[in-house]
């Protein structure tokens, strides 16, 4: 029991809902970049509607290999439970929303993304700026899995990372697991889009896990 209480004490949850940020400005506490510096770096601004504030990536640069990222400055972790609400707004090339973790720099990180144009959810490693989809545990390399990702509506994407095992969830349903050990060091977490995706994000929730978690 003492060990369990210690573990719970070592786990912390925080939710970034952007309610204290200024509309029309980038959110505080984030850094912005783009993989391999291909295309425009992205325009991440806080927006507001009747339901409250949210973060939007608003730059519609259609460069296909363009991957804008927004990462939290003050959180570095190895094992995380990471989720976000997202809403694809527009994009002729892509309508993508992603979560990144163990982010070392703009060219090296893990990524899971949902795409409303492809209707699938795929987990990748980005290593040296090269994006590679990873095989699903027990299924092989299938390019993720099909999922109905609605455009213009809010959905929830989640990944649970424990050591070299990653569990992927979409709208509360578990989709698959992936095992990979490319990045084992702690890194930052954040958000990701692709090409001309204009995407809204809200309620970025991060639970950091105790190092001794089984």
Which residues does each predicted region cover?
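Short, aromatic/His-centered strand-loop micro-motif at the edge of beta-sheets
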Residues: 129-156
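Localized edge beta-strand/strand-to-loop motifs within extracellular or lumenal beta-rich domains
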Residues: 153-167
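Short, solvent-exposed beta-strand-to-loop segments that form ligand-recognition rims
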Residues: 169-190
């Amino acid at each position: 029991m003492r060990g369990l209480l210690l573990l719970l004490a070592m786990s912390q949850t925080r939710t970034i809902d952007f309610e204290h940020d200024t509309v029309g400005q980038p959110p505080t506490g984030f850094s912005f970049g783009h993989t391999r510096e291909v295309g425009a770096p992205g325009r991440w601004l806080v927006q507001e509607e009747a339901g409250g504030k949210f973060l939007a990536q608003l730059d519609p640069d259609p460069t296909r290999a363009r991957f804008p990222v927004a990462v939290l400055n003050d959180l570095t972790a190895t094992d995380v439970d990471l989720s976000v609400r997202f809403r694809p707004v527009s994009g002729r090339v892509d309508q993508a929303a992603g979560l990144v973790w163990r982010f070392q720099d703009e060219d090296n990180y893990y990524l899971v993304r949902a795409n409303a144009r492809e209707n699938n959810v795929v987990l990748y490693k980005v290593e040296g700026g090269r994006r590679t989809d990873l095989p699903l545990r027990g299924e092989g390399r299938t390019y993720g899995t099909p999922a109905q990702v609605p455009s213009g509506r809010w959905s929830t994407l989640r990944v649970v990372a424990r050591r070299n095992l990653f569990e992927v969830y979409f709208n509360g349903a578990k989709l698959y697991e992936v095992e990979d050990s490319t990045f084992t060091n702690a890194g930052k977490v954040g958000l990701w889009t692709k090409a001309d995706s204009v995407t809204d994000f809200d309620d970025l929730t991060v639970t950091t896990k105790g190092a001794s978690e089984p």
